[in-house]
Design a protein with these regions (language model features):
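Acidic/histidine-rich catalytic neighborhood of metal-dependent amide-processing enzymes
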Residues: 1-87
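Active-site-adjacent substrate-binding region
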Residues: 64, 71-179
Length: 179
């Protein structure tokens, strides 16, 4: 939807935007796997790990990246993660601050959510692109939404208000970015 809105808008952002879709983030090695390591992330983040080591353009670089992961649950809450804060605190503050200004503070919580290995980590480490993670991670038990990795993880649990909060926040950040 973000790509469609930018494409159809008569006013374009002042900066270039690349949208990259990663696959095989949740692949992971089975608990009983005894073979050679699949990658340094336990077999997770395969798509982002591959992309970050085989960039689509020679000498590709980006000022920053925003990873959107599981951003549609009705009761989603997004806390900043430690990896994002370590490499891109100004971008985290910009995104969470923008969400607050737009009235989405009930989704974008101003507190540390701890660490998580997600697709932004290989991009940060291999491609050297500061990337933040917007991910619905429950604070107290470090789990995801109730339907995560179940048959209940379907379009019926997607909430348009959550998508609106994330989409409007990201669009506002992109349109406010100066070259």
């Amino acid at each position: 939807e973000i790509a469609r809105l930018i494409h159809s808008s008569s006013q374009k952002p002042n900066v270039g935007i690349d949208i990259i879709l990663f696959d095989a983030e949740d692949w992971g090695a089975p608990n009983d796997y005894t073979g050679a390591p699949i990658n340094e992330y336990g077999g997770y983040c395969l798509g982002s790990d591959y992309w970050s080591k085989n960039l689509h353009k020679a000498n590709y670089s980006a000022y920053f990246g925003i990873l959107l992961d599981m951003v549609g649950d009705k009761n989603a809450t997004f806390r900043y993660d430690s990896e994002s804060m370590q490499v891109a605190p100004s971008i985290v503050n910009q995104v969470w601050g923008t969400a607050q200004k737009l009235g989405f503070g009930n989704y974008f919580i101003l507190e540390d959510g701890g660490g998580i290995v997600d697709d932004h980590v290989p991009v940060i480490r291999n491609a050297k692109i500061p990337m933040i993670d917007i991910i619905d991670l429950r604070k107290n038990d470090k789990t995801f939404f109730d339907q995560h990795h179940t048959h209940g993880d379907s379009i019926e649990v997607i909430d348009k208000n959550t998508l609106k909060a994330v989409g409007q926040t990201v669009l506002q950040v992109l349109y406010e970015e100066k070259p």
